Design a protein with these regions (language model features):
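Short solvent-exposed strand/turn elements
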Residues: 118-124
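A glycine-rich beta-to-alpha transition motif near the start of alpha/beta enzyme domains, typified by
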Residues: 1-111, 125-127, 134-137, 142-259
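Membrane helix-loop-helix hairpins that form the core translocation module of multi-pass transporters
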Residues: 110-118
Length: 259
């Protein structure tokens, strides 16, 4: 069977969005074929019929949540609908509620997207051997905020076992150095670990952590390896109440994969 998909560049985190309806039990295999055929693709999402009144449902390859893919899907829906500016509502795997993405066309096939990200279900400190590191838990994915105390080789060695320890569907190790971020993400169901060019949920996790640590609202611009993501984390009476992520997405082209 042939499956059509769009290759999209959201701040360098190259994403495939499959528009042909695919059964859930086939999605991991299809994602693997797409990523093997084009090694620049870092993740795959599938468009499905929404359960509610959203424009579409985005189901990620491992059932995880992804902010960059959400902006990508919203940009694709806007482009296909001829919308230059407006709001696109999505259902997204790993998110308990529909997400509203505000899109604005920048030029042909490129959109700026701002999305109200899900709030973390918890921010805590976890022990990993001799290391004690902050963990920001979202529905569908958890992120560990790392510094130079964790080596790259140790990250690559331990990410799978740490994901299991945290009982997470997916795990990001976010190497944060000032305003620079280097994300490493593992998805349990597909057993894939990728040094991503940018990570929206990981950037959001860092902003949430920094705001909680400061006890005050924060607006941060994080330089991911291939672009900047801006996040506004708002606190009211010391409680995190809003996370707004802004990034761009370029629709690069449409492709086919045969299974």
């Amino acid at each position: 069977m042939e499956y059509s998909y769009y290759k999209i560049d959201p701040t360098g985190n190259i994403t495939a969005i499959v528009e042909t309806l695919a059964e859930r039990n086939k999605q991991s295999r299809i994602a693997g074929l797409i990523m093997a055929a084009d090694t620049t693709i870092e993740q795959v999402g599938f468009l499905e019929k929404p359960q509610g009144e959203a424009a579409v449902r985005l189901q990620m390859m491992g059932g995880e949540f992804c902010g960059n893919a959400s902006i990508s899907a919203a940009a694709l829906m806007a482009c296909k609908s001829g919308i230059d500016s407006g709001n696109i509502t999505l259902e997204v795997s790993g998110a308990d509620e529909p997400l509203c993405v505000k899109v604005q066309k920048l030029c042909d096939n490129t959109f700026l997207g701002t999305v109200a990200m899900p709030l973390p279900v918890g921010i805590e400190t976890a022990s990993f051997g001799s290391l004690k590191l902050p963990v920001v838990r979202f529905p569908g994915i958890s992120h560990v905020i790392c510094d130079s105390s964790l080596s790259v080789s140790d990250a690559e060695t331990n990410i799978r076992s740490w994901c299991e320890e945290l009982q997470a569907d997916a795990l990001g190790l976010m190497f944060l150095d000032g305003d620079r971020l280097k994300p490493y993400v593992y998805v349990r169901s597909t057993d894939t670990a990728v040094w991503e060019s940018s990570c929206a949920s990981g950037s959001t996790a860092c902003a949430a952590y920094l705001a909680a640590k400061a006890g005050a609202s924060q607006t941060v611009a994080l330089q991911n390896p291939r672009g900047e993501l801006r996040i506004k984390a708002e606190l009211i009476d010391g409680a995190l109440c809003s996370l707004l992520l802004t990034g761009s997405a370029e629709i690069m082209g449409k492709h086919l994969i045969c299974t």
